[in-house]
């Protein structure tokens, strides 16, 4: 079947689009070549970086309490299994409880030793959220918590996860240090059977067992598994190496709460990477390292993050003024402004920018996440024009801030702002004015070789004592099963990743046929925005409704019914084709040379037009997507779903 898809992102001539500067085409060529040779490291030395450094194995670590599986126990059962105990998993658990399920109905599992997801694993110095904490930290209205700052540090974000778990008593229903390798649908029992393993917090041993669940939700995030680049010579390097997601305070000194890295005062430190993590960690390392060398493959645009302490008087007045539902309304106000390329405030609630930060002054980001205007014929020209003004201001700021002209030139971002997730910080560019800080521009090639002494680049050796890998996270496949690192087999043994190989097919972006009672929030065929917590919350709200209503459809008189719900073939085809019809909303991302928002990254590198279109998010943006789900629920008919049950 051929799907109309015009303009076709795969066929856009990059050179035909007005460029912000000539270097766009140069970086496109360099970065594409570099990405082609990028691999994940197979080094035995770096494989150790995947281990959890925060468990209580050395006596000075702290892990959250959870449920231990006795070695004699072989099976565990639950009505609803939630994979993931970060903000996503917690939101699903809370929304399920609010929809009427009991605490005993829910079981959460996570490979980490505590709650928090990415905020459990990431504890590097300088860590903070880059989305306003008043909209990013979930369930503020329900918990009554007031964030300390507009953008809070990582320790507070992790603490908030613990706060949510404590309020809803989720510790008693969570298995930490637990991984699931296989998830198999049992048609006869109308259950998912999970093969699980829980590691011992005090030893290297693990206990294997089975979890049976009526429903399963893959709520694991994408920012927990370190992306380790292939670096020839890494095993020969005499110094120390670690990834930012597994920070080694034993080597640097300090702790997550007090990052006084006094052991680096005489050290020569190298940082590989200049993405979102590096932007936060580089200024902190510069405060303590004897020498700091930053190896940059491609520059990133860093906007000013105007952080400040929360004014509690303002907080109370703002909540009283907006009333119940204030956090969701603030989230939706944020979503509206980051996609408002025409600067049209069509609704009363959107006339005032509530968040007022670098994000809400960045409407060209709609090129990456979709929006109400993306499907209009002149959108590509419009978004380029809007972004050119932003880029012009950013370049002027860099040139006026960084003293050395050559360094300033190397830091200039030469791609459109929507191509990579933007960064925001106070003081990143000023760091390069310090005499002991040096920027090494690899012109798109990246670091390709290590020696015993350090980094070898263009025949020159940079001697180092410590190499910090700020190389991001291994997002992996776009298939929900692969991202969860679980082999998922549905009806008749069908593998989910095999179905995804032909291109995703979903209903509302959260479920797929032949995999009944399975839900997976994600980006393909679903609404997306910069605030991932909001995305998780809307998905949790929708999935909780579906599961609750599925039970409500059970005929009276059934005791302990087994419910089976999945989309009909017609409904799945319809939603998939509706997504495909809007995929041209992301045509502007074809211009991008790199980043998680490129056509290639979102489609797994597919050159097939229809398959590429199937991988795209909902093109009309998050507000449109949420409205469709709300109207569907309001009807109350569960249209498009097949519901069956059996009981006694």
UniProtKB/Swiss-Prot annotation:
GO MF terms held by the record: oxidoreductase activity
Function: FAD-binding monooxygenase; part of the gene cluster that mediates the biosynthesis of terretonin, a fungal meroterpenoid that acts as a mycotoxin. The first step of the pathway is the synthesis of 3,5-dimethylorsellinic acid (DMOA) by the polyketide synthase trt4. DMOA is then prenylated into farnesyl-DMOA by the polyprenyl transferase trt2. Methylation by the methyltransferase trt5 then leads to farnesyl-DMOA methyl ester which is further subject to epoxidation by the FAD-dependent monooxygenase trt8 to yield epoxyfarnesyl-DMOA methyl ester.
Enzyme nomenclature, EC number: 1.14.13.-
Record-level GO BP terms: terpenoid biosynthetic process
Pathway per the UniProt entry: Secondary metabolite biosynthesis; terpenoid biosynthesis
Superkingdom assignment: Eukaryota
Protein family (similarity comment): Belongs to the FAD-binding monooxygenase family.
Cofactor(s) this protein requires: FAD
Record keywords, A-Z: FAD, Flavoprotein, NADP, Oxidoreductase
Annotated knockout phenotype: Impairs the synthesis of terretonin but accumulates preterrenoid.
Protein name: FAD-binding monooxygenase trt3
PANTHER family per record: FAD-BINDING MONOOXYGENASE AUSB-RELATED, L-ORNITHINE N(5)-MONOOXYGENASE-RELATED
Residues involved in FAD binding: 118-121, 130-131, 136
InterPro entries (alphabetical): FAD-binding_Monooxygenases (IPR050775), FAD/NAD-bd_sf (IPR036188), FAD/NAD-binding_dom (IPR023753)
């Amino acid at each position: 079947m051929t799907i109309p898809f015009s303009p076709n992102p795969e066929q856009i001539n990059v050179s035909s689009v007005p460029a912000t500067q000539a270097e766009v085409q140069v970086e496109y060529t360099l970065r594409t070549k570099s990405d082609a040779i990028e691999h994940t490291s197979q080094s035995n030395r770096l494989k150790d970086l995947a281990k959890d450094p925060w468990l209580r194995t050395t006596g000075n670590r702290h892990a959250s309490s959870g449920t231990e599986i006795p070695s004699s126990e072989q099976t565990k059962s639950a009505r609803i299994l939630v994979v993931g105990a970060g903000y996503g998993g917690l939101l699903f658990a809370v929304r399920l409880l609010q929809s009427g399920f009991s605490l005993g109905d829910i079981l959460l599992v996570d490979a980490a030793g505590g709650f928090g997801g990415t905020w459990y694993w990431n504890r590097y110095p300088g860590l903070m959220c880059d989305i306003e904490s008043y909209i990013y930290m979930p369930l503020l209205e329900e918990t009554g918590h007031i964030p300390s700052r507009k953008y809070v540090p990582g320790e507070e974000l992790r603490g908030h996860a613990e706060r949510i778990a404590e309020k809803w008593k989720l510790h008693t229903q969570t298995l930490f240090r637990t991984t699931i390798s296989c998830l198999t649908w049992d048609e006869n029992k109308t259950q998912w059977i999970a093969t699980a393993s829980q590691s011992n917090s005090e030893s290297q041993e693990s206990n294997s067992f089975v979890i049976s669940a009526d429903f399963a939700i893959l709520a694991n995030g994408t920012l927990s598994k370190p992306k380790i680049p292939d670096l020839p010579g890494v095993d020969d390097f005499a110094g120390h190496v670690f990834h930012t997601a597994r920070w080694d305070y034993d080597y640097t000194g300090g702790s997550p709460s007090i990052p006084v890295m006094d052991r680096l005062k005489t050290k020569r430190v190298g940082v590989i990477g200049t993405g979102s993590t590096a932007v936060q960690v580089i200024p902190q390392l510069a405060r303590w390292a004897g020498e700091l060398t930053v190896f940059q493959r491609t520059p990133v645009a860093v906007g000013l993050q105007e952080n400040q302490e929360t004014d509690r008087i303002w907080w109370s007045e703002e909540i009283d003024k907006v009333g119940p539902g204030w956090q969701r309304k603030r989230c939706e106000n944020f979503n509206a402004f980051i996609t408002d390329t025409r600067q049209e405030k069509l609704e009363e609630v959107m006339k005032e920018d509530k968040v007022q930060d670098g994000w809400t002054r960045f409407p060209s980001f709609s090129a990456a996440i979709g929006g109400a205007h993306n499907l209009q014929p002149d959108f590509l020209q419009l978004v380029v024009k809007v972004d050119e003004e932003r880029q012009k201001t950013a370049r002027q700021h860099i040139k006026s801030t960084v003293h050395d002209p050559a360094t300033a030139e190397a830091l200039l971002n030469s791609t459109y702002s929507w191509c990579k997730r933007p960064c925001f910080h106070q003081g990143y560019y000023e760091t390069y004015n310090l005499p002991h800080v040096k920027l090494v521009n690899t012109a798109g090639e990246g670091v390709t070789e290590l020696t015993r002494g350090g980094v070898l680049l263009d025949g020159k050796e940079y001697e180092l004592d410590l190499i910090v890998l700020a190389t991001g996270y291994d997002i992996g496949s776009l298939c929900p099963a692969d991202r969860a690192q679980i082999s998922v087999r549905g009806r008749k043994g069908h593998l989910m990743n095999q179905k995804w190989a032909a291109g995703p097919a979903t209903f509302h972006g959260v479920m797929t046929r032949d995999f009944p009672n399975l839900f997976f929030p994600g980006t393909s065929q679903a609404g997306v925005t910069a605030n991932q917590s909001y995305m998780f919350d809307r998905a949790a709200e929708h999935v909780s409704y579906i599961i609750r209503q599925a039970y409500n459809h059970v005929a009276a008189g059934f005791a302990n019914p087994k419910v089976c719900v999945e989309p009909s073939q017609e409904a799945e085809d319809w939603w998939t084709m509706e997504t495909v019809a809007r995929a041209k909303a992301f045509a502007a991302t074809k211009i991008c040379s790199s980043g998680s928002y490129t056509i290639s990254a979102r489609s797994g590198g597919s050159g097939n037009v229809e398959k590429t279109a199937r991988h795209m998010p909902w093109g009309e943006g998050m507000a449109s997507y949420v409205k469709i789900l709300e109207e569907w629920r309001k009807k109350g008919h569960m249209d498009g779903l097949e519901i069956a049950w059996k009981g006694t």
